Amino acid sequence: MKIDFLTLFPEMFQGVLHSSILKQAQERGAVSFRVVNFREYSENKHKKVDDYPYGGGAGMVLSPQPLFDAVEDLTKKSSSTPRVILMCPQGETFTQRKAEELAQAEHLILLCGHYEGYDERIRSYLVTDELSIGDYVLTGGELGAMVIADSVTRLLPAVLGNETSAQTDSFSTGLLEYPQYTRPADFRGWKVPDVLLSGHHQNIERWRKEQSLKRTLERRPDLLEGRKLTEEEQELLDSIRKQQEK
């Protein structure tokens, strides 16, 4: 996979792309990153990339020309049609399901804006997706783009080294992850649940399902709305609700 970032602040990406999972993914050849300062594509003699909004108003608006030229140049060098993603608080909320969808693409181009906003023609004629990482406003799109790149990259084959890790993460199953424990079995009097020490894999699996459902019900009940539960999951959920009513 190729992931390109179009930004006015390329230095923001240095630490993120050269650390942890993203660094390992590049070393394993699973992904390549490219950070491009789209100011370099500006035809303005002063390399301006923004201008005042027509009709008046506060702030500056990103001009279409530099971003169109940058995307078109990156697309020329691509063997497949890229997903061009605009980081924007008005966009679709980014979810694990969206990450899984994007992980199937060969090439992503993430547009990171600053200033008041984008010329509407960028939205209408250049991008394929508009994404937001939450209902709040950031100074620019760079942090959101980093979040998306991390979330997508860890889903690529061989990146985590243990495929089960990605499959059992919170949200990957549509539920929050069950509690995890490691040694020691007793820390300051706080003990690991006996079932996890039993070696009985069937009981452990059932406990994990129950805890995952319980945690989801308590913290993110919206994830259960409209979810098609298995017979075992429904039985466990009914039991959890009865216990909570006592």
From Swiss-Prot:
Entry GO terms, CC: cytosol
Entries under Pfam families matching the protein: tRNA_m1G_MT
GO annotation, biological process: tRNA N1-guanine methylation
InterPro entries xrefs: Alpha/beta_knot_MTases, tRNA_m1G_MeTrfase_C_sf, tRNA_m1G_MeTrfase_TrmD, tRNA_m1G_MTases_N, tRNA_MeTrfase_TRMD/TRM10
CDD domains in UniProt: TrmD-like
GO molecular function: tRNA (guanine(37)-N1)-methyltransferase activity
Superkingdom classification of source: Bacteria
EC number: 2.1.1.228
Compartments, as annotated in UniProt: Cytoplasm
Residues annotated as transmembrane: none
Reactions it catalyzes: guanosine(37) in tRNA + S-adenosyl-L-methionine = N(1)-methylguanosine(37) in tRNA + S-adenosyl-L-homocysteine + H(+)
Keywords for the protein's UniProt record, in alphabetical order: Cytoplasm, Methyltransferase, S-adenosyl-L-methionine, Transferase, tRNA processing
Residues engaged in binding S-adenosyl-L-methionine: 113, 133-138
PANTHER family, alphabetized: TRNA (GUANINE-N(1)-)-METHYLTRANSFERASE
Family membership noted in the UniProt record: Belongs to the RNA methyltransferase TrmD family.
Function: Specifically methylates guanosine-37 in various tRNAs.
Assembly and oligomerization: Homodimer.
Protein name per its UniProtKB record: tRNA (guanine-N(1)-)-methyltransferase
Species for this entry: Halalkalibacterium halodurans (strain ATCC BAA-125 / DSM 18197 / FERM 7344 / JCM 9153 / C-125) (Bacillus halodurans)
